[in-house]
A protein has these predicted regions:
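Extended basic (Lys/Arg/His-rich) segments that typically form rRNA-contacting surfaces
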Residues: 1-219
Length: 219
């Protein structure tokens, strides 16, 4: 897995290309505050990886094992720690910078964005699982109900994993193949085309696309 970074979704806007006459909706992601927490190697840990920490946090809000781990490697208390693993033979980036940011990406690059979707609360099966519902004809009183949920006398219970009403949303989702429209290192923000999972202020992970290579590798 190539190196990625953690960011905060600030919201959406649009970018207009004067030459092409195209308006592109983009999501603005703030990537300031990333810090290398630990570099793992095959000799010391059995595999190559790097841990990236994000978001300053009060010490009393971080549990002691995590706080001790971060302090051991020279990082302060952080909200999120994410590990990016590198395969054997994969090129590893330079970790001397200490604070990775928007410069890891470039205009025109394809990325995958991982986030947590918006919560919808307690919902029925029509909204939660896209059930078609019951007939809407005259006299019917169960328009949006799921219908039968059990088999009968045997097994005398509802099967596990039966699709039923419940809490909907707050799922971990990955949106693949989003194009980096603009990289602004001076502001430490990245503008990616389209929407990314989650609400404003939600945390996301940005990493190079698995299905589409970076511009240099594509040539």
């Amino acid at each position: 897995m190539p190196l990625g970074i953690i960011g905060k979704k600030l919201g959406m806007t649009r970018v207009f290309d004067q030459e092409a006459g195209i308006m592109t909706p983009v999501t603005v992601i703030d990537v300031a505050g990333n810090e290398f927490a630990q570099v793992k190697t095959t000799e010391t840990d059995g595999y190559n990886a790097v841990q990236v920490a994000y978001g300053d946090q009060k010490e009393q809000r971080v549990n002691k094992p995590d706080l001790g781990h971060l302090k051991k490697h020279g990082a302060g208390p952080k909200k999120i720690v994410k590990e990016f693993r590198f395969e054997d033979g994969e090129e590893t980036p330079d970790f001397s910078a200490g604070h990775p940011g928007a410069e890891l990406f470039q205009d025109g690059q394809w990325v995958d964005v991982v986030g947590t979707t918006k919560g919808k609360g307690f919902q029925g099966v029509v909204k939660r699982y896209k059930f078609s519902g019951q007939p809407d004809s005259h006299g019917h009183m169960m328009h949006r109900r799921p219908g039968g949920v059990g088999a009968g006398t045997w097994p005398g219970r509802i099967w596990k994993n039966k699709k039923m009403p419940g809490r909907h949303g707050t799922y971990r989702r990955t949106t693949q193949n989003l194009k980096v429209v603009q990289v602004r290192p001076e502001d430490n923000v990245i503008l990616v085309s389209g929407a990314v999972p989650g609400h404003k202020g939600g945390y996301v992970v940005i990493r190079p696309s698995k299905k589409k290579p970076a511009p240099e590798a594509a040539k």
